[in-house]
Amino acid sequence: MKFNITSGELVKALSAVAGVVPSKATLPILENVLFESVNGHLRLTATDNEIYVVEQVEAEITQDGSVAIPARRLLDTMRQLPDIPLSFDIDDRCIVKFKTDRGAYKLVGAKAEDFPSLPSVLEGTTVVIDTDSLTSAIEKTRFAVSTDDLRPNMMGVYFQVDEEKTRLVATDGHRLVRLIKYNMKGDIPVNFIIPDKALAQVTRTLNGGETTMQITKHHVRFTNGDAEVIARLINESYPNYENVIPKENEKIMTVSKEDLLATVRRVSIFSSSTTRQIRLNLSQNEVSIFAEDYEMSSEARESVKCQYDDEDMVIGFNARYLADVLNNVSNVDVTFAFSTPNRAGIVQPLDQEEDEDLLMLIMPVMLNTQG
């Protein structure tokens, strides 16, 4: 195999796929990137056997072929080079040689046939969506995904696709996000869970234009221009999340997202490093945020103007979880809907963005003092 390419183009393509390469793989071949000549282009593929990332790049192919090349060493070398022309020459023993106008380098590759084949994702449900809308939806939900290995069904974002809309749901038991996208529709209804790691790779790989999602029983494929991400789905049943969303929430507070978020971040510095507990005291058109740390004999209190005309109420939250929820609402003002201090609070943007309906839920914490 022989080809010519600039180091700038190669480092861009390598960076797009290398994020999935395991640093210490049980199968040594997975520490490589597969290089293939396909229809006059150079195609790069990387995988950890759960996620596959494919990137195609322009190159001058002078001899067709394929080879697996150590990913880290090649990428580290490319990053240290200026944007200059490179000539690659790979022989039948998988010896990889490449030259610049200044020097020559040699690596030992591996046979392409030892590299895992891409899963077949040919049939199933198809969804076509604007890429920016898709990546925005992923970012608004995946922050709430569980990291608990004992609950694998919650370690991804749950997609419910039908002919009219798609629901994306994520929860870790403390927070829950339900995002309905009306501009994201499937030709066949289907429900599936995509692992968080795969979605993180999707947001790094996809760039502009439209993205096509193809969903089969075991895999999902994202295609965006010359880039492709294939991921194995989580083969578990998702919890019945609708049951935990309170239906009657008569206490409504509307507040500036930025004002409340900044206040929560400041006051939480004084909260217990163990519980991260803060207290919200709701009163007429004002919410007071209070935190204290017994061990350090420190406390903080700030008030924020809001719209609230119900009876006074005190409710506690984990400061980090509350900040995460607020940080993932892009609108100016948010509404909080409460029923009682021991039931979940619902957070929504005052004005929903076009073609979507965002609902976030945060569980309260047991208050241990009266602040």
Question: What feature does the model see in each segment?
Answer:
Residues 1-371:
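Structural preference for solvent-exposed beta-strand-turn elements
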